[in-house]
A protein has these predicted regions:
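Helix-to-loop junction immediately C-terminal to a conserved catalytic motif
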Residues: 138
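Catalytic Walker B motif of ABC-type/P-loop ATPase nucleotide-binding domains
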Residues: 254-257
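Conserved ABC ATPase signature
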Residues: 229-233, 237
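H-loop/switch region of ABC-family ATPase nucleotide-binding domains
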Residues: 21-22
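Conserved beta-strand-loop-alpha-helix hinge in the C-terminal portion
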Residues: 40-70
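Conserved ABC ATPase "signature" region
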Residues: 207-225
Length: 274
């Protein structure tokens, strides 16, 4: 819809368009020129123009270089990041006749099982209730009706099976949530401290917590921002930080709302592998 609306405006008015995009495929029929910026190196905050020309020429001549540098190159296959062992484990999270929504039910009578070691994709158009259902599964939004239940083996001592009734510290290390808007979960003034919150809250020592934080920052290509304020990062960097923060707490169940949005090819691949 966005593509078609933009195309109509260009055809009608002859306006010049500059589009900033990781996934250029959808715009190729409208694009006359492609400019590719390189990733800044460790000693510099600035990148440089590494390719500039007609789309066919740029991708034909520099496709391998661009792919190696992390760009999404049209026609390139996405790597298979599935684990070698796809055996389904025990049921760790389930729903019983779940109705979810914010006042008005967006879904009713839902019965689902989620297994250890299994990755489930929740899909649907805008407004279908994906984010609302994700918050409900993570124990952060009360169901309208029915239940979200966690396995007996994962529930806190002296607590029931419904995560919505748990305290925040009881959710930690059991169910993690990566929000659609990363800023909603930031609680520190520095990136490194943000990632260390989970391990610290779980009782890990200072050294261990920051070792975990350093490892996660490296895996997410965020090490050079360790002393930066989370709110100064780009949209894609904020999203990687929110994922790193949740992974640092090693939850048994991880619910992520559009975690790879705004990522280039290399950061997308690294996040999916994790």
């Amino acid at each position: 819809e966005v593509h078609d609306a933009v195309k109509k405006v260009i055809e009608t008015t002859g306006q010049t368009m500059v589009v900033v995009e990781h996934h250029i495929d959808v715009w190729l029929d409208l694009v006359d020129r492609v400019i590719v910026l390189g990733r800044p190196d460790a000693d510099s905050q600035a990148g440089a123009v590494i390719a500039d020309g007609k789309p066919d020429e740029v991708f034909a001549q520099m496709g391998d270089v661009l792919a190696a540098g992390g760009a999404w190159v049209p026609g390139r296959a996405i790597p298979d990041c599935r684990p070698d062992d796809e055996t389904r484990g025990e049921t760790v999270l389930s729903t019983e006749n779940l109705s979810f929504g914010r006042g008005t039910a967006l879904g009713t009578g839902i019965n689902l099982d989620f297994h250890a070691g299994e990755v489930t994709a929740l899909m649907g158009p805008n407004g279908a209730g994906k984010s609302t259902m994700a918050l409900t599964l993570a124990g952060l939004l009360k169901p309208i009706d029915g239940k979200v239940l966690i396995a007996d083996s994962l529930k806190p001592p002296h607590a029931g099976q419904e995560p919505i009734n748990w305290k925040s510290k009881e959710l930690l290390g059991r169910i993690g949530m990566v929000f659609q808007e990363p800023e909603h979960q930031f609680a520190s003034n520095f990136v490194r401290d943000e990632v260390a919150i989970g391990p610290k809250s779980m009782g890990h020592g200072e050294d261990e917590a920051y070792q975990t934080a350093n490892r996660m920052l490296e895996q997410m290509n965020l090490t050079r921002f360790a002393k930066a304020n989370p709110y100064t990062l780009s949209g894609g960097e904020k999203r990687r930080l929110s994922v790193a923060s949740m992974l640092a707490a090693a939850p048994k169940v991880l619910v992520m709302d559009e975690p790879t949005f705004g990522q280039d090819f290399s950061t997308w691949t690294e996040m999916v592998k994790l």
